[in-house]
Regions:
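N-terminal Sec-pathway targeting helices
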Residues: 1-20
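Non-catalytic accessory segments flanking enzyme active sites
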Residues: 54-56, 60-136
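Short beta-strand element of the alpha/beta-hydrolase
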Residues: 131, 140-150
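Cap/lid segment of the alpha/beta-hydrolase catalytic domain
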Residues: 148-251, 255-258, 305-306
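Primarily recognizes the serine-hydrolase "nucleophile elbow" in alpha/beta-hydrolase
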Residues: 251-311, 334
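Mobile cap/lid helix-loop segments that gate and shape the active-site cleft of serine hydrolases
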Residues: 291-345, 366, 370-391
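Conserved strand-to-loop "acid loop" that flanks and positions the catalytic carboxylate
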Residues: 350-365, 408-409
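C-terminal catalytic histidine-bearing segment of alpha/beta-hydrolase fold enzymes
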Residues: 375-440
Length: 440
């Protein structure tokens, strides 16, 4: 190849890859949604059923005690009709800890690799590797942001010293490959890796694990993943991938909760898109998670079903049948028949702080529907006397609100402005991490 041809060939390769990613984006988001803009008035019919109305075998909820009595029924209904059961109980055990870099990121952080083993009551075990990044210039104990990575530790933390994963990952994940910058161009500069320096500078640690070690995002591999946990993948109540990821987050919390360098009440969940669904479910099930940063979670996350705006259940069940319970597909053509919806999921996290992120041109994720769900979930925070201040306009970000929504321009993805808002929100509620008063 002559030197003159190399730039041309490289350009053609990048254009070809970009076209491929554009096709992938169009498959995930219909073209008409790429030119639509979210309704910032968040208008729509009344959310039904109302959160505290009679139902689930109980009278109307009028007190905090009533609400606590209703919680188990709501969780059971969410598992049965949307997410599938949680995997059986297990405890995380540290097998080995390795110091990767004592002064990474220009001396800002210490990187460790932890090999974990999840031990079930029947003696069965599965392994999970994670990385912990500790800021060197912040006093401890530290709050920690938990992140599930689809590409592995090296890609998420931008250091080859963590090594390439053996488990399943998508083609755009290769560190230094051509696809990574294309993914960043289309889905945002932080879709594969968070702004590590900014997070460390704010005094937060990072805990990252490769999700595919326990739950690969592949329909063909999901049954095998469940079988490793001793589960029958053919039962109606088998865990969907979102449920499996949420369970893994709790197992990582088992391990982090034993590290005295970290705040006992300082576990913060972050997720984007499908992982944003999982962090909401994890926090709804496990009160150890003190805060949730959920970005563009869409259908099966914070957005309401049946709005007629975002991704319908029929589409998500056809494209990703392994994500949810088998029963969920039965609501594909009658979403309003679901006995539970996003406002129930959000309410189970009360009174802890939750940030919902959206984008103006990401109507497939239906940010207006997520905002309406947040307003419908407000009574749960009110019962805890934790709903003041409260964000009441979709286009006015109020980081001090316990359930807030941040909107930016653009499409589906993770941008620097998303992370600035998330860190501002975390800072606004940091005092809550210190006192740990978040009883649901």
């Amino acid at each position: 190849m002559t030197p003159r041809l190399r730039p041309l060939i490289l350009t053609l390769a990048i254009v070809s890859l970009a076209a491929g990613f554009a096709a992938y984006l169009s498959a995930c988001t219909p073209v008409r949604h790429l030119v639509m803009t979210a309704d910032m008035t968040a208008r729509g019919p009344a959310v039904s059923p109302a959160l505290l109305a009679p139902g689930f075998g109980q009278d109307a909820v009028t007190s905090l005690q009533d609400w606590r009595s209703r919680r188990p029924a709501l969780q059971s209904a969410l598992d049965e009709h949307i997410y599938g059961a949680a995997p059986p109980p297990a405890q995380a055990r540290l097998i080995a800890s390795t110091l990767i870099d004592p002064a990474a990121y220009g001396g800002a952080g210490r990187i460790e690799r932890h090999a974990l083993e999840f031990v079930f009551e029947d003696g069965r075990t599965v392994t999970q590797t994670m990385a912990l990044v500790l800021p060197l210039n912040a006093p401890g104990p530290l709050p920690v942001i938990l992140i599930a990575s689809d590409c592995g530790l090296a890609a998420a933390l931008e250091t080859e010293a963590l090594g390439e994963p053996d488990a399943f990952r998508h083609g755009y994940c290769e560190v230094g490959g051509l696809l990574s910058p294309v993914a960043g161009f289309i889905f945002g500069e932080h879709v594969l890796s968070p702004p590590i320096a900014d997070i460390l500078a704010r005094g937060y640690a990072l805990a990252v694990w490769h999700e595919s070690e326990t739950g690969p995002d592949s329909e063909s591999l999901h049954a095998e993943a469940l079988a490793r946990l001793g589960l029958d993948p053919d039962t109606d109540d088998r865990p969907g991938l979102i449920s499996l990821w949420a369970w893994t987050m709790s197992r990582v919390a088992d391990h982090l909760g034993a590290d005295d360098r970290l705040l006992p009440n300082g576990l913060i969940l972050y997720g984007h898109s499908r992982r944003a669904k999982a962090v909401l479910l994890a926090a709804a099930r496990d009160s150890r998670f003190a805060m949730v940063l959920s970005l563009q979670s869409g259908t099966g996350g914070a957005s309401l079903h049946g709005d007629g705006v975002g991704e319908p259940a029929a589409s998500i069940s056809q494209s990703y049948p392994h994500w949810f319970a088998r029963r969920y597909a039965g609501y594909a053509h009658d979403e309003n028949a679901l006995p539970v919806d996003a406002h129930h999921l959000l309410a189970l996290i009360a009174p802890r702080p939750v940030l919902l992120g959206g984008a103006m041109r990401d109507t497939w994720s239906d940010p207006a529907g997520a905002f309406r769900a947040a307003q419908a979930a407000r009574p749960a925070w009110r019962l805890h006397e934790a709903d003041e201040p409260w964000q009441t306009d979709l286009d006015t970000f109020e980081p001090g609100s316990r359930l807030a929504t941040h909107m930016r321009g653009g499409l589906h993805g993770v941008r620097a402005s998303d992370w600035r808002a998330m860190l501002d929100f975390a800072d606004a509620h940091r005092a809550l991490l210190e006192d740990g008063n978040r009883q649901p």
